[in-house]
Amino acid sequence: MLDVSGGTATNVTQHDGAILKTNTNGTTVSGTNSEGAFSIHNHVADNVLLENGGHLDINAYGSANKTIIKDKGTMSVLTNAKADATRIDNGGVMDVAGNATNTIINGGTQNINNYGIATGTNINSGTQNIKSGGKADTTIISSGSRQVVEKDGTAIGSNISAGGSLIVYTGGIAHGVNQETGSALVANTGAGTDIEGYNKLSHFTITGGEANYVVLENTGELTVVAKTSAKNTTIDTGGKLIVQKEAKTDSTRLNNGGVLEVQDGGEAKHVEQQSGGALIASTTSGTLIEGTNSYGDAFYIRNSEAKNVVLENAGSLTVVTGSRAVDTIINANGKMDVYGKDVGTVLNSAGTQTIYASATSDKANIKGGKQTVYGLATEANIESGEQIVDGGSTEKTHINGGTQTVQNYGKAINTDIVSGLQQIMANGTAEGSIINGGSQVVNEGGLAENSVLNDGGTLDVREKGSATGIQQSSQGALVATTRATRVTGTRADGVAFSIEQGAANNILLANGGVLTVESDTSSDKTQVNMGGREIVKTKATATGTTLTGGEQIVEGVANETTINDGGIQTVSANGEAIKTKINEGGTLTVNDNGKATDIVQNSGAALQTSTANGIEISGTHQYGTFSISGNLATNMLLENGGNLLVLAGTEARDSTVGKGGAMQNLGQDSATKVNSGGQYTLGRSKDEFQALARAEDL
């Protein structure tokens, strides 16, 4: 560091980062720095470099030319001193109480203090602050830079380029402003503020508490304070107009990406809202807003009522207690908070509405947005999107493609589910839902009471969920698990059904209905019709199931199953079927390591199996007893889709292959009888046989 104040230093070599502290008061310094030769002589400083804590005072009647102020460098131009062609780089600071001309600001800061004058400043980036009593003339404000005019500061002839900002505080003065397209003016209508100039549309003024023809864009902002006004304001993308309590605006144009915020008790008349323009307001008493929305409809907020308000693109409306909103449209990124009453809101994609405790919503139409209900919502229509009933309640909701979620002690009453989903979460309750074409899903800790399950609808009761008082039609799909806490109801045929304490009784499964009988639980007298399925897990037991077009998958134990036309019982590895009765058109499939004993195979019934290891089968048919044990099949009857695969190293004896039946022998067989319409294959691969079995040419 070199500190020279009033002394002499010659032949100085100032390296990068070196600190020079000096002034022009009787000081003589000469040498070189990274920018070239520099000197201070006879009160004149030339080409001085200031950085890293370096400082230069230009004393009264002294001057500085081509000073460079870098990071952490500072220069003070004192009263009656002058500085010309100063360059202020990033992190540099210049304080002016005298005169500064032709300054270039490249990321640094210039402070024009009391009695200071700056002329011809070019702000490429960084900031020029005009303090009380300071003045700036003919300033160019480029993109990314800003000029700040404080109270009693003055800016004359400022040119704001696109991306640049002119910020005028209360009581600041800015005359002859040239506001180019894409530039930002930040100001207010407070006492003493005096601004005039030209923007892309016209001559504009902010003076005497009134703003006229102001254009706001690209972070530009005008605050209209109490007892002042603004007329003919244009709010473009990135611009914002704030209307405070007891302030007034007239003829505001709110364009796409602009924001009009009318605070409680503010007034905005003749608003012209274009698509994408954001309105922020409330229904607080004393607030007055009138105009046309982006759909061309008249809207208003007055006398504690909002009508036809459009909220989008960060727009929001707060409906306070004791007030109401009618026919609001909430588009993408619009928001509505209701503490009072709301009627007829349309929630489009990515719009949000919150109904708080003690508030009400009636006839909302949810089309991709989200409504959260802590209060009461009646007759909502959910076409897409979601309604979340979180501790509140709903009545007569119509779900036609969207989702209703009921949680946290929320309650949904008399919901009509045409398509879409009603999901009941922990501590949520749905009462009296009518399930026509969509789904009601009851999750752990949820409760559905008195649901009507019509043809085409699905009621899904999951582990630790509860559904009581169900009225089930013949084609209503019940999906349930024996891990459900409690399920009760009545089938279309009047039979009562239930699931309690791990036991399922008289369950009807059809049209996509599924009962999962979990390990260490049971089912009794399940009716599985077309499209239904019962899954009996390992260590689970199913007794008395009737399959009429449906399917039972046995991984545990199935007792006394009856398989009617179209029904299929599949015994998986380690599963066991006992006393299954297969009627005409029914099918029993026993896979490797499966077991089926005491079977009754009636005429026209199909048995599908093989002589694989672990398969054990026994039963009776019209020709007597039959069995498969120890890789030996005896007296098997194969017809109407039945088939037997005799594997290599195994044997079949006395088999009968009837019409529609098939047998493939890769091992040995004896006394096989093949009737008309039966298919016997010797020596083909297993894959070829299975392909034939799938075809209807057997």
Residue ranges and their predicted role:
Residues M1-L698:
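Long, low-complexity, polar and repeat-rich extracellular regions
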